[in-house]
Regions:
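Non-catalytic C-terminal interaction segments of nucleic acid-processing enzymes
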Residues: 153-217
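Short, well-ordered beta-strand micro-motif
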Residues: 87-88, 100, 212-214
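Residues at beta-strand starts and edge strands
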Residues: 82, 95, 137-138, 207-209
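Catalytic cores of nucleic-acid endonucleases
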Residues: 94-160
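Surface-exposed cleft-lining segments at the edges of enzyme active sites
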Residues: 16-20, 69-75, 104-117
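Interdomain/boundary linker segments immediately adjacent to catalytic/signaling cores
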Residues: 1-44
Length: 217
């Protein structure tokens, strides 16, 4: 049985809709999509693209790229993991959004959508590179959102923070993985230094949430 590309496309579109629903759909963004396909016996391969995007033509471009890829060369059971990382950002870097989708194949249960942040560091590094180019000022803030439901977890803003260093916990409150992923944000020289702390005690069977990281002047 060939892997269901229609279902795959629907999940990508759902991810895009979640990102766009957090902001004005009329605003234009640059976009970066990173897709990594890992198989049981064949070597994994990567589909990667970077383009100027907006809500009208981003989705068809990404979906066409997926359908034109080598997905049809594999059967569904060939895959053991599929990772999708999506980053959207305005040309002046004043706003950025990042989201992740991941599928893991379990031989007893089939395909499951896994929503955790284990491999989110690649986009974090890319965000860091963009931040270095941006001219952020004292009004810059970092907001961590829960995808579902979309609620703000915590906000960092240099102008109302007394210390030079503030920790943002990805999973706060009563979430089971509250201490597993953290960001350190340092304010210096009018810019934000975005650093990652490695996830600790990660467990494959735990529940994790989708997140959007938003940078806004």
């Amino acid at each position: 049985m060939i892997y269901n590309k229609i279902h795959f496309s629907q999940e990508i579109e759902k991810c895009l809709n979640n990102v766009y629903n957090t902001n004005n759909k009329e605003q234009n963004f640059q976009g970066r999509l990173y897709a990594h396909f890992l198989t049981f016996e064949k070597e994994g391969y990567v589909v990667e693209m970077e383009t100027s995007v907006n809500d009208e033509h981003l989705k068809p471009v990404l979906l066409k790229r997926m359908n034109d890829s080598r997905l049809s060369d594999f059967k569904k059971d060939d895959f053991r993991k599929i990772e999708i990382d999506l980053l959207l950002y305005k040309e002046d870097f004043s706003e950025m959004y990042a989201a992740e989708l991941k599928w893991v194949y379990n031989r007893s249960e089939g395909w499951n959508v896994v929503d955790h942040l284990e491999d989110f560091k690649d986009d974090a590094i890319f965000c860091h590179q963009l931040i270095e180019k941006a001219n952020f000022n004292e009004t810059c803030s970092v907001v961590v959102y829960d995808f579902n439901p979309k609620k703000q977890v915590k906000r960092y803003s240099p102008r109302n923070t007394e210390t030079q260093q503030e920790k943002l916990e990805f999973l706060g409150g009563s979430y089971p993985a509250a201490d597993h992923g953290k960001i350190i944000v340092d304010e210096h020289g009018g810019k934000i230094d975005f650093k990652w702390i490695d996830l600790k005690d990660y467990k494959e069977d735990q529940d994790y949430k989708y997140y959007i990281i938003r940078f806004k002047k």
